[in-house]
Amino acid sequence: MALWGGRFTQAADQRFKQFNDSLRFDYRLAEQDIVGSVAWSKALVTVGVLTADEQRQLEEALNVLLEEVRANPQQILQSDAEDIHSWVEGRLIDKVGQLGKKLHTGRSRNDQVATDLKLWCKETVRELLTANRQLQSALVETAQANQDAIMPGYTHLQRAQPVTFAHWCLAYVEMLARDESRLQDTLKRLDVSPLGCGALAGTAYEIDREQLAGWLGFASATRNSLDSVSDRDHVLELLSDAAIGMVHLSRFAEDLIFFNSGEAGFVELSDRVTSGSSLMPQKKNPDALELIRGKCGRVQGALTGMMMTLKGLPLAYNKDMQEDKEGLFDALDTWLDCLHMAALVLDGIQVKRPRCQDAAQQGYANATELADYLVAKGVPFREAHHIVGEAVVEAIRQGKPLEALPLADLQKFSRVIGDDVYPILSLQSCLDKRAAKGGVSPQQVAQAIDDAKARLAL
């Protein structure tokens, strides 16, 4: 049943109907549409459109419909209704007859869909927050178990300075904490109800919109009807949150793909999150991580697409805005799936400590320590930097690490170097010296783990 047929003398072309209809994706808003309709029925009682008995009948029928939808949401797709609003109204009329036709009084699909989508977004944000914190917790637990796993840290994918696997885990905890904060901020701006704004100019009935917002669990009602039905900032914000969050997960995946490679060999992934080759029997491929990395692109595309859709739209509602849902649903589904999968990857990961430490001892990752040693002896840092560079060239020529160079060879580059340099060049010394807040020293890493556990209530 179309909700707008009286103005037209010809039926819609079937090709246009298929092009125009949105039920195939907005059926996901069924629960929110029904909940919003229950609240609207209560509001209509306050302005005399419905009697208390009529409202009771409508609410009972809507609650039955809600249970039917929860039991089998796919039933909705068997209908040829234009959208979820048409489907809900049609099913309501099936249940209560002519009374069902009174429910839409004073309401437009413009404020209705805006309300439905905000309700759905609020629920989905809470799911994302839960999954985000679960992944943070998994990273903290992995960090706690690997505080003594020394490995090389990289810049430009070249070994740079020694770190620990725990410190690496905690870097991603920080990224995820920012993602969590962004979602919390978005949730605050989501928490205003557009219901009662009508098509664009507000409703003609003196409904208490603040009360109506409270019935739906919103903190307040929106302030401007024209903005309320035009606004899709929350869609852009959530897509932006997802895009940033997926960049973090993609970097996490890329790091672990490299760590798991034969060239690095720092970790072993569980069989539960890897697959094999149809030709090469020895292969164990990090498919879960590669898919996380690959899915990042589709989320970025959803954000870009929505920004382009909205950029030239006049106020208020335009059918272009129907394009908000598919990209949003897919992006947030993808982000949620990837958060869960990243946590699963960490469950069963094995850190190969000897291989990590061997790699950290190569590549002259302790060169900065030698420069700092020279600074402590009174050599200006820029000069110390040059001296150490020359010492590294000599070590490479001899095929030795810095700490294996004889003292006489080191003193060719600076006479201030003494026997006390060798303890300074050990990996543990490199870590211990990074004791300022946020550093990689064992004390700082342990403190960071404790702080994260307290914040996450672990």
Swiss-Prot record:
SUPFAM superfamilies: L-aspartase-like. GO terms for cellular component: cytosol. It is found in: Cytoplasm. The keyword Lyase applies. Gene3D superfamilies: Fumarase/aspartase (C-terminal domain), Fumarase/aspartase (Central domain), Fumarase/aspartase (N-terminal domain). Belongs to the lyase 1 family. Argininosuccinate lyase subfamily. It catalyses: 2-(N(omega)-L-arginino)succinate = fumarate + L-arginine. Its main location: cytoplasm. The keyword Repeat does not apply. GO terms for biological process: arginine biosynthetic process via ornithine; L-arginine biosynthetic process. This is Argininosuccinate lyase. Keywords: Amino-acid biosynthesis, Arginine biosynthesis, Cytoplasm, Lyase. Pathway: Amino-acid biosynthesis; L-arginine biosynthesis; L-arginine from L-ornithine and carbamoyl phosphate: step 3/3. Its EC number is 4.3.2.1. GO terms for molecular function: argininosuccinate lyase activity. InterPro entries: Arg_succ_lyase_C (IPR029419), Argininosuccinate_lyase (IPR009049), Fumarase/histidase_N (IPR024083), Fumarate_lyase_CS (IPR020557), Fumarate_lyase_fam (IPR000362), Fumarate_lyase_N (IPR022761), L-Aspartase-like (IPR008948). It comes from Salmonella agona (strain SL483). NCBIfam families: argH (TIGR00838), PRK12308.1 (NF008964).
